[in-house]
Amino acid sequence: MERKDIATPSRTKALLDQFGFNFKKSLGQNFLVDVNIIHKIIDASEIDDNTGIIEVGPGMGSLTEQLAKRAKKVMSFEIDQRLIPVLKETLAPYDNVTIINEDILKADIGKAVKTYLNDCDKIMVVANLPYYITTPILLNLMQQDIPIDGYVVMMQKEVGERLNAQVGTKAYGSLSIVTQYYTETSKVLTVPKSVFMPPPNVDSIVVKLMQRETPLVSVDDEETFFKLAKAAFAQRRKTINNNYQNFFKDGKKHKESILKWLEQTGIDPKRRGETLSIQDFARLYEEKKNFPELEN
């Protein structure tokens, strides 16, 4: 007898009943129950039988199942121990799936990739990300030395819009800068609340992030560069001059240096962080090397 797709309301409900599973709000559990949405996610990821997949938060395996049919291998991180027996049953037909019962933020992802996906030509992150930790997960993956080619991920609409936001818009901020520094970003589709069980309180969006061959700008210390950019958005309604006076050690004392630094970079101190492009921040970063008194 042919197995029914996991991503239907009836099959998901049957599994919930079979395993006596109750959703944990603290883990942001909202299971996808529309296989058409899943196919659109997978189509956008352009995976083939040489692709290795990193998935985060497989839930009951609705996306995992469809990924396993098209990818070479799927490696899924699931933090909730209660879902492991469910996944062992739902994904039993697929010997190309590895479930890792760990917190993705604490796991040695590089080691796991070498262990399970070393023979894959391409590696993609494809996931319905837990909404409460979407940003930490993405930043953690992007900033590690892992050969990831791209990401097709579902997340809260508001967060997705920030990833793809253009300079000068309300959604543009430090998260936009980090993601666009590493990747080319685009929107795939908006997802209604009705395709989840239980329905989330927020609208959802699928975003595609393809790794750049080289970062958008060249800096020699990414961590310091990102801190400098983030500081400009500390209080969005304040000018970059005010934000940097609060950011640097003894910033008030060095306010003349801050003004000179901004002016020598060709940036009006009265501007707000949201008006500065990634290239502007790269110029600020380079020029700051001439002002050793500006420390944080």
Curated annotation (Swiss-Prot):
Enzyme Commission no: 2.1.1.182
Recorded catalytic activity of this chain's protein: adenosine(1518)/adenosine(1519) in 16S rRNA + 4 S-adenosyl-L-methionine = N(6)-dimethyladenosine(1518)/N(6)-dimethyladenosine(1519) in 16S rRNA + 4 S-adenosyl-L-homocysteine + 4 H(+)
Subcellular locations according to the entry: Cytoplasm
Keyword annotations: Cytoplasm, Methyltransferase, RNA-binding, rRNA processing, S-adenosyl-L-methionine, Transferase
S-adenosyl-L-methionine is among the record's keywords: yes
GO MF term (any one): 16S rRNA (adenine(1518)-N(6)/adenine(1519)-N(6))-dimethyltransferase activity
Cellular compartments per GO CC: cytosol
Pfam families, per the entry: RrnaAD
Binding site for S-adenosyl-L-methionine: 30, 32, 57, 78, 103, 128
Main subcellular localisation: cytoplasm
CDD domains reported for this sequence: AdoMet_MTases
EC top class named in words: transferase
Keyword Endoplasmic reticulum: no
Matches recorded under InterPro entries: KsgA/Erm, rRNA_Ade_diMease-like_C, rRNA_Ade_Mease_Trfase_CS, rRNA_Ade_methylase_Trfase_N, rRNA_adenine_dimethylase, SAM-dependent_MTases_sf
Source taxon at top rank: Bacteria
Family, per entry: Belongs to the class I-like SAM-binding methyltransferase superfamily. rRNA adenine N(6)-methyltransferase family. RsmA subfamily.
Reported function: Specifically dimethylates two adjacent adenosines (A1518 and A1519) in the loop of a conserved hairpin near the 3'-end of 16S rRNA in the 30S particle. May play a critical role in biogenesis of 30S subunits.
NCBIfam families documented for this protein: ksgA
Protein name: Ribosomal RNA small subunit methyltransferase A
Upper lineage: Bacteria, Bacillati, Bacillota, Bacilli, Bacillales
Name of the gene: rsmA
